[in-house]
UniProtKB/Swiss-Prot annotation:
Species this chain originates from: Aeromonas veronii
Biotech / industrial applications: The antidiabetes effect of BefA was evaluated using type 1 diabetes mellitus (T1DM) and type 2 diabetes mellitus (T2DM) mice models. BefA protein significantly reduces blood glucose levels, maintains the body weight, improves the glucose tolerance and exerts a protective effect on islet beta cell morphology in a T1DM mice model. It also downregulates the expression of TLR-4, p-NFkappaB/NFkappaB and Bax/Bcl-2, and the secretion levels of the pro-inflammatory cytokines IL-1beta, IL-6 and TNF-alpha.
GO cellular component: extracellular region; host cellular component
Note: Membrane permeabilization by microbiome-derived and host defense proteins is necessary and sufficient for beta cell expansion during pancreas development, potentially connecting microbiome composition with diabetes risk.
Highest taxon above the source species: Bacteria
Coiled-coil intervals: none
Region feature (SYLF domain): 99-261
UniProt remark on domains: Contains a lipid-binding SYLF domain which is essential for activity.
Protein name: Beta cell expansion factor A
Length: 261
């Protein structure tokens, strides 16, 4: 059995295992898969729908199931999330600079999963807001979309009621330098349908009045929605306190969204 077929067999065996199966075994399998994917990254991208999507789906099952299950983000969730992120971030590094729309969508979806788990690990109270959210959007400063300019980021808005994904772009002054680090991620939670739909269909520009939930004061309290939105920014070293998103703009990525229908 060649390496490609072996990976596919492993992926499918993981995909049919319970989401909360023996984590040690899942972690070991994910580690092995990650190492093999690293060696065959070119082959991965040659057949995204047949290989990369299946291999990542098996690893990401825990993450998606975890953040879509209502309830408190516990110490156990944090510990498991940290281990999951090690495997997820390794896979995500292979997805930089996608060449096709399919590759870009898979990369952005994967990025969004990692951002949510990272956020809940940093601030568990955000999980309670997420449980109440009608929808959410996640953005990243790295190159996970096609033909992005220096100050642009890529992201996806997800309707939690229907599961529909709308791919989007973001412009912000802090994106070029990753706000002092290699990258940063932004998570926006929407309290209701009206606010979410307006963001997706009309785009949005952040004003100076818009605050980031994770400030010095609110980080110690139970987070609340502000004007129907809750906004968090996360860097490679954790939650960015008092981050200023004033002037940031968001709009639909028609190329990725329309070709996904």
């Amino acid at each position: 059995m060649n390496k490609r077929n072996w990976l596919l067999a492993l992926s499918l065996s993981l995909a049919f295992s319970p989401c909360y199966a023996d984590w040690a075994k899942l972690k070991a399998a994910a580690s092995d898969l990650g190492a093999a994917v690293s060696e065959t990254s070119k082959e991965v991208w040659q057949d995204v729908s047949d290989f990369s999507k299946k291999s990542w789906a098996s690893i990401s099952a825990w993450g998606e199931e975890a953040f879509n299950t209502a309830g408190v983000w516990t110490d156990k969730s944090i510990a498991t999330g940290k281990e999951w992120l090690k495997a997820a971030d390794k896979e995500l590094n292979e997805m930089l600079n996608p060449k096709t729309a399919k590759e870009a969508r898979i990369a952005i979806n994967t990025m969004a999963d990692t951002a949510l788990i990272r956020l809940f690990n940093e601030q568990p109270s955000a999980k309670l807001l997420f449980d109440k959210a009608y929808g959410y959007a996640v953005f990243d400063s790295r190159k996970f979309s096609l033909m992005l300019h220096t100050n642009q980021g890529a992201g996806v808005a997800v309707n939690r009621k229907t599961g529909k994904h709308t791919y989007m772009k973001m412009f912000g002054a802090g994106l070029a330098a990753g706000i002092g680090g290699k990258f940063y991620q932004q998570v926006i939670l929407f309290e209701d349908k009206a606010r979410f739909d307006a963001f997706v269909t009309q785009g949005w520009e952040a004003t100076s009045e818009v605050g980031v939930v994770a400030g010095k004061e609110s980080a110690e309290l139970t987070a609340k929605y502000n004007g129907g939105m809750a906004i968090y920014q996360i860097g490679e070293k954790g939650l960015l306190l008092d981050a200023n998103i004033s002037g940031s703009k968001y709009w639909i990525d028609k190329d990725l969204t329309e070709t996904s229908r």
